[in-house]
C-alpha cells in the first residue's frame, strides 16, 4: 500500500474495499497485545474503512481486546484454497460451485504464489455467482 499508492487508488476506484491485514503476515498468536495495537495504529490512511482481517483468520478473544473500538474485525466465511498448488483450477472452481452460498465473504490471495492462478480462477467463479442471480460486492 505504501510502495504503490496508485494501485490502491485503482482498486478503490474500481469499487473494491481497501482494508487491513497487518503490516506483516505474522500470526497474532505469536504477538503480544501491544504489538497488535502498534500494527493497527501504523495502518496506512489509505484504507476505505477501518476493517481488519487477522492473518490466517485467527484472533483469540483475548488478543481481540487489542483492536481499537473504531475498527471492525471482518472474517471470511469461504476460503478459496487458491494457495494450494495441489488443487487444479477445475477442482477449485468445482469446490466453489458446490459450497459458495449467498452472503458469503470470499477470500482469495493476491501474491506471487497465486496471481497466475487468479486470472483463471476468478472468471468462472464470478460467472457462477452471477448465474445464480447473486451479486459480488464490496463490504462498504
Which positions does each model-derived feature cover?
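Acidic-and-aromatic substrate-binding clefts and catalytic sites of carbohydrate-active enzymes
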Residues: 1-4, 26-34, 53-60, 81-87, ...
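Conserved, mostly hydrophobic/aromatic
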Residues: 18-21, 52, 73, 106, ...
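C-terminal domain-boundary segment and adjacent tail
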Residues: 1-3, 114-140
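His/Asp/Glu-enriched short active-site or ligand-binding loop at hydrolase and phosphoryl-transfer sites
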Residues: 58, 64-97, 134-140
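Active-site beta->alpha N-cap acidic-glycine motif
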Residues: 1-36, 41-42, 48-49, 135
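Alpha-helical scaffolding segments of alpha/beta enzyme cores, especially the outer helices
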Residues: 6-13, 38, 42-45, 66, ...
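A cross-domain feature marking catalytic cores of carbohydrate-active enzymes
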Residues: 20-22, 54-56, 77, 110, ...
Amino acid at each position: 500500500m505504501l510502495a504503490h499508492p496508485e494501485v490502491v487508488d485503482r482498486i478503490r476506484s474500481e469499487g473494491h474495499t481497501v482494508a487491513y491485514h497487518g503490516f506483516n503476515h505474522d500470526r497474532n498468536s505469536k504477538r503480544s497485545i501491544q504489538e497488535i495495537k502498534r500494527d493497527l495504529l501504523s495502518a496506512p490512511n489509505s484504507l476505505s474503512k477501518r476493517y481488519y482481517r487477522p492473518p490466517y483468520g485467527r484472533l483469540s478473544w483475548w488478543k481481540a481486546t487489542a483492536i481499537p473500538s473504531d475498527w471492525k474485525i471482518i472474517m471470511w466465511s469461504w476460503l478459496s484454497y487458491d494457495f494450494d498448488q495441489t488443487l487444479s483450477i477445475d477442482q477449485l472452481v468445482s469446490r466453489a460451485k458446490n459450497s459458495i452460498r449467498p452472503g458469503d465473504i470470499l477470500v482469495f490471495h493476491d501474491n506471487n504464489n497465486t496471481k497466475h492462478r487468479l486470472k483463471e480462477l476468478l472468471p468462472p467463479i464470478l460467472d457462477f455467482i452471477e448465474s445464480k442471480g447473486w451479486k459480488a460486492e464490496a463490504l462498504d
